[in-house]
């Protein structure tokens, strides 16, 4: 039985971890995940999906704010793991930790060397890519730059958003890891170096990127909305108040960027730099998420054709 240390945080990671837990060839000695966070207006403490799964299986849990130089690092190294598996962990691993195990493998949600970094799924959708994928790769000190063990891809559908693609890639990543790891560990599967000259990056989404730019084309705005749903969520402004936009669809019509060009009891169409979009699901500041018809029956009823949002 191969003894593993698992490192990851979101549901993507938990899906991969569950696959390892269900496989009798591996024993998970411990998991390292991000600290619990206070979320929402009530500041409720939320544990990570990886921690929740570890609790259910009685696995030791380590949650350092920063792994390097921490007491947890010493404790982790004393576990005596054969190898490390990471998936969306969100921290660099200290060299001393990498050197302490026989192998360290990362499950990365992009077709490397494209989209190294923390938000590959967001950028794949926002950039209008036709496919996304997962790469199983060796871990080195440089971010997502290690040799590639295996790859798998899937189409990005017009109906996909970050949430749906996240779920698809988690399953692909889980299966790809379990399929490739035995051959990798036996030496049968030889890793392939990345072409570093082709590397692109997907840094974590900044608050400024969440704001919609209505001068973009309708397709670009549409991709941007999908590439922010369900987190961190794209937004615009209406009368100085933030209006989050979860869902929209391409629509007919032209106008000035951000201009209301159609308004009925159940629809609101906004012009982009080229083309237009019909808003479907929004969330006004301080209100719950709602269908556009409910918004137009309330806060949005003052909007008229010719008015502007995003100003």
Swiss-Prot record:
Q: Where in the chain are disulfide-linked cysteines found?
A: none
Indicate the family of this protein: Belongs to the Fmt family.
Coiled-coil portions: none
Q: Give me the reactions it catalyses.
A: L-methionyl-tRNA(fMet) + (6R)-10-formyltetrahydrofolate = N-formyl-L-methionyl-tRNA(fMet) + (6S)-5,6,7,8-tetrahydrofolate + H(+)
Please give the Gene Ontology molecular function terms for this protein: methionyl-tRNA formyltransferase activity
Protein name according to UniProt: Methionyl-tRNA formyltransferase
In short, the EC number is: 2.1.2.9
Keyword annotations for this protein, in alphabetical order, are: Protein biosynthesis, Transferase
Question: SUPFAM superfamilies attached here?
Answer: FMT C-terminal domain-like, Formyltransferase
Q: Which residues bind (6S)-5,6,7,8-tetrahydrofolate?
A: 110-113
Question: What broad taxonomic lineage does this protein's source fall under?
Answer: Bacteria, Bacillati, Bacillota, Bacilli, Lactobacillales
Single GO cellular component term: cytosol
Q: What does this protein do?
A: Attaches a formyl group to the free amino group of methionyl-tRNA(fMet). The formyl group appears to play a dual role in the initiator identity of N-formylmethionyl-tRNA by promoting its recognition by IF2 and preventing the misappropriation of this tRNA by the elongation apparatus.
| EC top class named in words | transferase
Q: Which CDD domains match?
A: FMT_core_Met-tRNA-FMT_N, Met_tRNA_FMT_C
């Amino acid at each position: 039985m191969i003894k593993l240390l698992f490192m990851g945080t979101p549901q993507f990671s938990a899906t991969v971890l569950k696959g390892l837990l269900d496989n009798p060839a591996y024993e998970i000695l411990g998991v390292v995940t991000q600290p619990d966070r206070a979320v929402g207006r009530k500041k409720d403490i939320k544990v990570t999906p990886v921690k929740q799964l570890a609790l259910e299986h009685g696995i030791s849990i380590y949650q350092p704010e920063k792994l390097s130089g921490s007491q947890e690092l010493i404790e982790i190294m004393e576990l005596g793991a054969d190898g490390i598996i990471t998936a969306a962990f969100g921290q660099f691993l200290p060299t001393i930790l990498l050197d302490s195990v026989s192998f360290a493998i990362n499950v990365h949600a992009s077709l490397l060397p494209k989209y190294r970094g923390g938000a590959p799924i967001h950028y794949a959708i926002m950039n209008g890519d036709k496919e996304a994928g997962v790469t199983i790769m060796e871990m080195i000190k440089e971010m997502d730059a290690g040799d590639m063990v295996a790859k798998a891809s899937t189409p990005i559908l017009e109906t996909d958003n970050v949430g749906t693609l996240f779920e698809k890639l988690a399953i692909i990543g889980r299966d790809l890891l379990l399929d490739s790891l035995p051959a990798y560990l036996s030496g049968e599967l030889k890793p392939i170096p990345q072409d570093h000259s082709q590397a692109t990056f997907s840094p974590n989404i900044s608050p400024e990127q969440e704001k919609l730019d209505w001068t973009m084309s309708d397709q670009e705005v549409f991709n941007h909305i999908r590439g922010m749903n369900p987190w961190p969520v794209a937004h615009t402004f209406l009368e100085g108040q933030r209006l989050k936009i979860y869902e929209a669809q391409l629509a007919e019509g032209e106008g000035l960027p951000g201009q209301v060009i159609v308004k009925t009891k159940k629809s609101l169409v906004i012009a982009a730099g080229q083309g237009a979009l019909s808003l479907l699901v929004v969330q006004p500041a301080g209100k719950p998420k709602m269908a556009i018809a409910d918004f137009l029956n309330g806060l949005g009823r003052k909007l008229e054709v010719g008015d502007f949002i995003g100003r």
